[in-house]
């Protein structure tokens, strides 16, 4: 039967600005013939001619089937399995399919990331969006196109059209921070991803996410992976998000030594944070240890940057870090000073390479720990009475912990986690200095935990 199908180009007839397919033309011809009001005739010859035409049409449908023989409901059910780009291609074939493709049920979850979308083509994609569109994902190409800067018109179109938008994913585009503020994004979204985006014209005295907690009160997931413009002081603003559960900052290479910001953010914010991704950053023990105060944390991902692996501090060439301009103004958050840029003449030559590495100190800060016991009474000669041991449960619900390629993570971390991380279900210590014996001991104590090590790869 497939061999008898008529090619699509032979089934369509071009007319100005649109196409009429073979089946559409046949139906239109039948409608026109019925509207001509033929003369009344009861002759037997006319009846035979009518039956003959009906038989020919039926035989033609059987021998030359067309997709347009299906009803609109059947076609709509078929189209729901196609991706948005295929739907757009089908809409160009004929008028009937174009009308079906525009059905709002097909455009509730829209993901255009299969191929990069150039800015010149973006308008053609936006016109298919509907008020009930809840998910929108687009991807550009920073290396293919010189001008990939999103316009304010794009964000206005989304805000005005997609009034129920819950998820917005924008990858590998340029955003002009002087023209587009965080308040220009739809305030209804619950998930925002700017993975791989470039941000230009950022203000030095204010975080790009300033007052984001008021504009997006329902945001639960924020993905800023590979955003090289993200700076540590923005942690203070993000920590104020009242419903934030997932934060991904992996490959944000400017996220380095920031114990002051991390301490304030975790002490007064991140009250609902569950998933934290800090892989491929230069955060150290002090910063990671601050998140031990986040009681809701269940998933923590840490991995040493590839540029810092297998490197000995003594063998490194001096690499002084670039220093900020001395007279640059401080950064303000909510009228409070959040960041000072200080230049004290200290030469940052190979300043403690280990400072950028996670060690047992950070891992042992996670989970429960025994606090210092208070002396109750020492009045009796030679007798000191102290209070009973108390345990502080910092992360009682930590379920997933990934600590990869840190040479200063040893068996001490395994011993601590075996005793104190009671909710742990998954542990990845690949590339660390744990021993095979230490892993076997951990497995014997916590058989319910799936542990991934470098020994599994050999």
Segments the model singles out, each with a brief description of its role:
Residues 72, 87-104:
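Short helix-loop-helix/strand-helix junction enriched in hydrophobic and basic residues
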Residues 1-69, 341-346, 458:
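CRL adaptor-proximal regions
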Residues 70-82, 96-98, 110:
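Short hydrophobic alpha-helical "box" of cullin-RING ligase substrate receptors
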Residues 99, 124-128, 153-160, 180-184, ...:
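Recurring C-terminal helix/loop segment of individual leucine-rich repeat
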Residues 114, 140, 172, 191, ...:
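Structural position within Leucine-Rich Repeats
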Residues 116-121, 142-153, 172-180, 198-207, ...:
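Short, solvent-exposed loop/turn at the beta-strand->alpha-helix junction
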Residues 103-106, 129-135, 160-167, 184-193, ...:
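Leucine-rich repeat
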Residues 111-166:
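F-box-proximal linker/hinge
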